[in-house]
């Protein structure tokens, strides 16, 4: 079958896990739960507020680094992020490589009043209704994981439920596909999910080709304020930070430092 990439391996596990969950809770039941959930928050308004938005992530592990942090209480961590000034909280729900869960999403949603992102490998409509049922306001769609018709239909379904899609890209070609699908919020991941290699110049290469009305989020590679300022200078509206926060020892202060840098008068302003 040729050499499978890291992404291929993750997606194989995700499909099996979704099928197992759907065998327990039917699509019809998940749809009903989604309809009963409180209305989603306005993500775009939160991200368009002045300054560089910080999306802080509850992240236990990653395929590249293994276990990052033992997070006994994701709600407590999310509350610390919120009090540090995060605009939104990202929650990993993929269980095999990231040690995430929908329980983490539930705990975070109950603890904070800012938008919550379900970060996972979304390949089926089931997962979108599931995200809404568990209180997500936005979710991740990864262009590299989806053929174009699937990307477009999953984006449309996300928006039909009142949620926002953060559409993740790693190349100019993927960025073109995201725009073609109608994405209004695009995340540029410096990490190649097929090889796990990081290309820090990725954002600076892709961002100039994105329209000014598209909100641009830099993902991966933010270890401190210097990285945030560099991304801001390259045109980022926001940054998504996980590893640098969960390994910091003081997540609230780590977020607050980024937020302070991102709202400082000397910080480059997004072009919008």
UniProtKB/Swiss-Prot annotation:
Keywords: Amino-acid biosynthesis, Aromatic amino acid biosynthesis, Decarboxylase, Lyase, Tryptophan biosynthesis. It holds the Pfam family IGPS. One of its GO terms (biological process) is L-tryptophan biosynthetic process. Pathway: Amino-acid biosynthesis; L-tryptophan biosynthesis; L-tryptophan from chorismate: step 4/5. It is an enzyme of class 4 (lyase). It comes from the Bacteria. SUPFAM superfamilies: Ribulose-phoshate binding barrel. InterPro entries: Aldolase_TIM (IPR013785), Indole-3-glycerol_P_synth (IPR045186), Indole-3-glycerol_P_synth_dom (IPR013798), Indole-3-GlycerolPSynthase_CS (IPR001468), RibuloseP-bd_barrel (IPR011060). One of its GO terms (molecular function) is phosphoribosylanthranilate isomerase activity. The keyword Lyase applies. This is Indole-3-glycerol phosphate synthase. It comes from Mycolicibacterium gilvum (strain PYR-GCK). The gene is trpC.
